[in-house]
């Protein structure tokens, strides 16, 4: 059986959007279970904007989340041209992203560093797993409309 290794830009965008939405579920669920503020992570992300420093902003956090998710989605798209993805490889890539985002960059921003780290790592793994799943090789006979899944 031949597997398609190509994906459409639309498929990449849809996968990235789904991953961006789903990726906040672990930390949100953890916050709700522990009685913490479920929007704290989004507000903390807002401090990554220039001149926001330690002034958390929900709107700023949404903007940062969309931008960072778009950047990592682009990186996944470029990597998927060379390597096959799936949920497991995507989750592993999510761990690599978490290492960069949380261990190297996030610790420089106190509001990010103060977040429950396990939940943040789970968010990154969820992002990678969902996007990896969206970019998985699909059997060519399963692709609609002339081999395109746009």
Language-model segments: what does each one mean?
Residues 1-150:
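Short amphipathic, positively biased membrane-proximal segments
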């Amino acid at each position: 059986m031949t597997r398609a290794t190509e994906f459409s830009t639309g498929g990449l965008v849809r996968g990235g959007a789904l991953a961006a939405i789903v990726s906040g579920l672990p930390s949100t669920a953890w916050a709700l279970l522990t009685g913490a503020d479920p929007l704290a992570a989004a507000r903390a992300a807002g401090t990554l904007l220039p001149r926001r420093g330690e002034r958390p902003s929900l709107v700023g956090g949404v903007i940062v989340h969309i931008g960072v998710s778009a950047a990592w989605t682009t990186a996944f798209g470029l990597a998927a041209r060379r390597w096959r993805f799936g949920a497991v490889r995507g989750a592993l890539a999510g761990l690599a992203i978490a290492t960069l985002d949380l261990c190297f960059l996030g610790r420089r921003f106190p509001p990010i560093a103060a977040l429950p780290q396990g939940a943040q790592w789970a968010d990154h793994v969820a992002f990678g797993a969902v996007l990896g799943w969206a970019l998985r090789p699909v059997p060519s006979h399963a692709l609609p409309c002339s081999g395109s899944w746009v």
